[in-house]
Swiss-Prot record:
InterPro entries: NADH_Q_OxRdtase_suD (IPR001135), NADH_UbQ_OxRdtase_49kDa_CS (IPR014029), NDH1_su_D/H (IPR022885), NiFe-Hase_large (IPR029014). This is NAD(P)H-quinone oxidoreductase subunit H. It catalyses: a plastoquinone + NADH + (n+1) H(+)(in) = a plastoquinol + NAD(+) + n H(+)(out); a plastoquinone + NADPH + (n+1) H(+)(in) = a plastoquinol + NADP(+) + n H(+)(out). One of its GO terms (cellular component) is plasma membrane-derived thylakoid membrane. Keywords: Membrane, NAD, NADP, Plastoquinone, Quinone, Thylakoid, Translocase, Transport. The gene is ndhH. It comes from Prochlorococcus marinus (strain SARG / CCMP1375 / SS120). GO terms for molecular function: NAD binding; oxidoreductase activity, acting on NAD(P)H, quinone or similar compound as acceptor; quinone binding. Signal peptide: none annotated. Belongs to the complex I 49 kDa subunit family. NDH-1 can be composed of about 15 different subunits; different subcomplexes with different compositions have been identified which probably have different functions.
Length: 394
């Protein structure tokens, strides 16, 4: 009777594109030696919709509603970068109040982004409970967005060249402060449940380690870069919008592993709360109801009718032409640096519109940090990167 020989050659396994932990339609062709990963080839492009070419055939006002479909967890960030590029190319100034409103929306989006990362990441490593908690807090952010823009998750269509589409509704700032007061203790609750949980720490500490040099060489950004000990945050580096008005710190860790990336994102939510609280207190003109009352009481020559108290500099006409020239502009999203290279041709549509997605660059290092890992660790490492395939493929 012949004995079956042990199989010794490597095995090739497909993870995805239809896999519950693939965060969209990502396919990983993984080569295994037993339970050890010896190679990994990500296959992307399943969600490519030609967003850049669409942008080159639309006016800016027409294109803004499209962009939140690239990354449904970072719609406000993409709206911001899409209007920032022609603003800078045309040297358009925006009112201080409009800048504060933008910061409020961006920081709410940063918290929503990290919450939507936290729940599925913990579900991937076996902790189901926080997945239900994070949606409780996200609902409050959706309610704030719905009150201000009319939409909840995507298609907010709120950012405009020169400012925003409309001023904040009455009572919105108070509701935002209520959210900050509610959410602060909830982060403490997450930390008690997760941060020092021995099972969670043993599951992800030391996984997917990236050194400071490797993080820089691979052009990583956002929490992926800061978790490796690089204090690089575009809100501090580029001084865009009005972030210099606020007192906040860059969230940073040194270890470069999955646990460090978790800690950076938790701390970023705390820092976003600090910015939100300060913005609610310092916004020029204060709450909309007070601002409108002051304008009415003081008449036509009221200082509150000045430029910095408006929500938009000047409403851009549908025939607004993007001037000749080219530039690259960027901002710090929840996932890292997103940017737009725009080339104008004195036409209503841009001649070239290149989008840099943060998660595409961050995803490129995945094969290198998976080598030597176990099969069970693939989803934990991929989850710690935080990718949304809509913006990877565009």
């Amino acid at each position: 009777m012949s004995q079956l020989e042990t199989r010794t050659e490597p095995m090739v396994v497909n993870f995805g594109p239809h896999h519950p932990s693939m965060h969209g339609v990502l396919r990983l062709v993984v080569t295994l030696d037993g339970e050890d990963v010896i190679d990994c080839e990500p296959v992307i492009g399943y969600l490519h919709r030609g967003m850049e070419k669409i942008a080159e055939n639309r006016t800016n006002v027409m294109f803004v509603p499209y962009v939140s479909r690239m990354d449904y967890a970072a719609g406000m960030f993409y709206e911001a970068i899409v209007v920032n590029a022609p603003e800078r190319l045309a040297n358009i100034s925006i009112p201080k109040r409009a800048s504060y409103i933008r910061v409020l929306m961006l920081e709410l989006n940063r918290i929503a982004n990290h919450l939507l990362w936290l729940g599925p990441f913990l579900a991937d490593v076996g902790a189901q409970t926080p997945f239900f908690y994070i949606f409780r807090e996200r609902e409050m952010i959706y309610d704030l967005w719905e009150a201000a823009t009319g939409q909840r998750l995507i298609n907010n269509n709120f950012f405009r060249i020169g400012g925003v589409a409309c001023d904040l509704p009455w009572g919105w700032l108070e509701k935002c402060k209520d959210f900050c007061d509610w959410f602060g203790p909830k982060i403490d609750e997450y930390e008690k449940l997760i941060t020092n949980n021995p099972i969670f720490r043993r599951r992800i500490e030391g996984l997917g380690s990236i050194s400071k040099e490797k993080a820089i060489n691979w052009s990583l950004s956002g929490p992926m870069l800061r978790a490796s000990g690089v204090p690089w945050d575009l809100r501090k580096v580029d001084h865009y919008e009005c972030y210099d008005d606020f007192d906040w710190n860059i969230a940073i860790a040194e270890e470069g592993d999955c646990y460090a990336r978790y800690r950076v994102r938790i701390e970023e939510m705390r820092q976003s709360l600090r910015i939100l609280r300060q913005a609610c207190e310092m916004i020029p003109g204060g709450p909309t109801e007070n601002l409108e009352a002051s304008r009415i009481a003081e008449g036509k020559n009221s200082p509150f009718a000045g430029f910095d108290f408006q929500y938009v500099a000047k409403k851009v006409a549908p025939t607004f032409k993007i001037p000749n020239g080219e530039l690259y502009t960027r901002l710090e999203s929840g996932k890292g640096e997103i940017g737009v290279f725009i080339q104008g041709n004195n036409d209503v549509t841009p001649w070239r519109f290149k989008i840099r997605a943060a998660d595409l660059n961050n995803l490129q290092i995945l094969p290198h940090i998976l080598k030597g890992a176990k099969v069970a660790d693939i989803m934990a490492i991929l989850g710690s990167i935080d990718v949304i395939m809509g913006s990877v493929d565009r």
